[in-house]
Every structure is written in structure tokens, then in C-alpha cells.
């Protein structure tokens, strides 16, 4: 099943970051995007996740073109079907880690998975305010929140950037298990080529073009 389709999208920020980008994301599929710092990887992820509008071309989610969706429909998709993991985490600072997860629990109507908390090693700090947590702990809370939400597509920008190798490997196992069990898809941006090649497909953003290398 096709979850996302990008057709000939381009975007400029002071200069053209990427041009004529096209690809598709299918159910149970993981795609990694690599490239040099400043190549436009994160901007591309923002366009694909509807946070930015492409200058040209189109993005479709679940066979519906974003540009023709009603605001109500797009808002519903963002709330329920898209999971975003970015380097800034976007956690609610006044809340505890558990309260941050409860926001996703309400959206998905699923119980918070205690095993998930254990595997991400955040069970012991779950009642603490997120401002008291380290960067790595905040990142793991952000990952747990997205998986609790149970989105159809995960967009992840350097999701293992603040984690040690053992924890990073466990996070990737969680992602791949989730994609398989829920029929979801994931687009991941990373500078780590070893991590990228764990995904089904790898694209490199270079000289404004997106090239499939795996």
C-alpha cells in the first residue's frame, strides 16, 4: 500500500536546496536519506511531513494530494497518522515524561506500553519533568511518545543522535518491529551511513538531486 508519494518537488531557502525530487513510501517500508550537512535533508523531511510547502511539485499522503486537502482533513492526518521525531524533541516542558506520553495515548486510544518504556530505559525517570532529563532521555521520551501515538508514517530526523550504540540499536529494532506489526512506513534522515543501510532503501541528497543508492 502506498503511504506517501512525492512528485517533482522542489524547495528554495535563500538558494535551491533540492529540485525535481520524486519517490514513494510503501507500507512496512523504511527509507533513509543521507547527505552532507546543509544539503537540505531536514528541509526535505519538513516538506514531506507537511511542515513546509514545496515551491513546486506535489506530495500525497494515503493517495490524497496535500495541496487539495481541506484544512480539517489535513489537520486530522497530522494529529493521528503522522509521527514526528526531530532533534528539538518538541516535548511539553511543564509536563512529566509520562504526561507527555499521555497526550499520544489520548490520540491513539491505546494504553502506554510498559515494555516500550523498559526497552527505551526510561521507566525509572517517567515521573520526572522533561526539563530534568538529559538530552538522550528526552530523545527516548520523544520516540516513546511517537510509538504510543501509533502513526501510519514516522518522520525521524537523526533519531539516534544523542544515544549510545546499544540504545540506538534497540531503538532501530523497535522502529522496524513497529513498521512490520502496524503496516506503517518510516522516512529517516541521518548522517550515519551504517544506520542508514539498515533501512530498506537509501537515498542521497547531493547537488539538489535525490539519488537512490540502495
Task: For every predicted segment, state its role.
Residues 49:
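Helix-to-loop junction immediately C-terminal to a conserved catalytic motif
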Residues 150:
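Conserved catalytic motifs of ABC-family nucleotide-binding domains
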Residues 57-65:
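Conserved ABC transporter NBD signature motif
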Residues 129-139:
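Conserved ABC ATPase signature
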Residues 66-83:
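ABC ATPase NBD coupling module
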Residues 154-157:
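Catalytic Walker B motif of ABC-type/P-loop ATPase nucleotide-binding domains
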Residues 65, 110-125:
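Conserved ABC ATPase "signature" region
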Amino acid at each position: 500500500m502506498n503511504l506517501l508519494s512525492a512528485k517533482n518537488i522542489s524547495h528554495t531557502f535563500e538558494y535551491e536546496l533540492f529540485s525535481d525530487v520524486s519517490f514513494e513510501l510503501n507500507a512496512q517500508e523504511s527509507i533513509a536519506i543521507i547527505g552532507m550537512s546543509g544539503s537540505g535533508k531536514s528541509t526535505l523531511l519538513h516538506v514531506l511531513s507537511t511542515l513546509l510547502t514545496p515551491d513546486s511539485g506535489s506530495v500525497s499522503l494515503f493517495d490524497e494530494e496535500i495541496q487539495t486537502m481541506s484544512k480539517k482533513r489535513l489537520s486530522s492526518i497530522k494529529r493521528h497518522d503522522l509521527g514526528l521525531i526531530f532533534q528539538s524533541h518538541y516535548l511539553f516542558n511543564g509536563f512529566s515524561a509520562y504526561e507527555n506520553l499521555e497526550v499520544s495515548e489520548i490520540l491513539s486510544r491505546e494504553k502506554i506500553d510498559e515494555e516500550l518504556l523498559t526497552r527505551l530505559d526510561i521507566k525509572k525517570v517517567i515521573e520526572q519533568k522533561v526539563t530534568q532529563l538529559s538530552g538522550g532521555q528526552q530523545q527516548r521520551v520523544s520516540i516513546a511518545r511517537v510509538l504510543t501515538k501509533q502513526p501510519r508514517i514516522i518522520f525521524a530526523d537523526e533519531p539516534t543522535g544523542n544515544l549510545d550504540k546499544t540504545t540506538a540499536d534497540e531503538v532501530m529494532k523497535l522502529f522496524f518491529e513497529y513498521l512490520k506489526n502496524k503496516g506503517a512506513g518510516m522516512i529517516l534522515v541521518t548522517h550515519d551511513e551504517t544506520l542508514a543501510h539498515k533501512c530498506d532503501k537509501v537515498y542521497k541528497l547531493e547537488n539538489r538531486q535525490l539519488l537512490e543508492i540502495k
